[in-house]
Amino acid sequence: MNAADISRAPPGYLEVAWIADTCKLLMGLGWTTNYAGMIYKSLKDRTYGMALMPLCCNFAWELTYAVIYPFGSRQDKFTHYFGLMLNCGVMYTAVKNAEREWTHAPLVRRNLPFIFIICIAAWTTAHLALALQIGPSHAQAFSAYGCQLLLSVGALCQLLSRGSSRGASYFLW
């Protein structure tokens, strides 16, 4: 996620740019590991590992910056496409297993496909609106922070509402 053109960066930054690149690589490896672990744990526990609202927000972010506003190096584009593909796996486990988690709320349970579609469309619209307001490169970074905050809060809410750690593990946390 480059929110600025580093070709115009001061020479002092260019000398240590490898640190930022290494951090981006580690972040990509972390997300890849987390997505793969989440898919595995979700299939094993027959539930989903990421709360629905953050999942839809994150999926919309991946869709927005892999398909609608792809930019950066080939490595950046590949990372976004790969993240989107893994996120499809996370989304699959959620769609497949969500009904089991919503037996206490029949209205939600009956409307889960509609809820997924509306949430993804709404979050995609939000990401696009932010990109139009401040530009895609800045919006990519800022909306990622928002997604991460929503993901953290959603994980805690999911843990509290389930009353157990089904779908989660120390590895994923």
Curated annotation (Swiss-Prot):
It is found in: Membrane. It is an enzyme of class 4 (lyase). Its main location: membrane. Belongs to the paxB family. Terpene cyclase; part of the gene cluster that mediates the biosynthesis of the immunosuppressants subglutinols, meroterpenoids consisting of an alpha-pyrone (4-hydroxy-5,6-dimethyl-2-pyrone) moiety attached to a decalin core fused to a five-membered cyclic ether carrying a prenylside chain. The first step of the pathway is the synthesis of the alpha-pyrone moiety by the polyketide synthase subA via condensation of one acetyl-CoA starter unit with 3 malonyl-CoA units and 2 methylations. Its EC number is 4.2.3.-. Induction: The subglutinol cluster is highly expressed when mycelia and hyphae are transferred to fresh media for a 3 hour induction period, remaining expressed under conditions of heat shock. The cluster is repressed in cultures reaching stationary phase or in early germinating cultures, as well as under conditions of UV, salt and oxidative stress. It holds the Pfam family Pyr4-TMTC. Keywords: Lyase, Membrane, Transmembrane, Transmembrane helix. The gene is subB. This is Terpene cyclase subB. It is a multi-pass membrane protein. It comes from the Eukaryota. Pathway: Secondary metabolite biosynthesis; terpenoid biosynthesis. GO terms for molecular function: lyase activity. GO terms for biological process: terpenoid biosynthetic process. GO terms for cellular component: membrane. The chain crosses the membrane at residues 11-31, 51-71, 112-132, 141-161. The keyword Ribosomal protein does not apply.
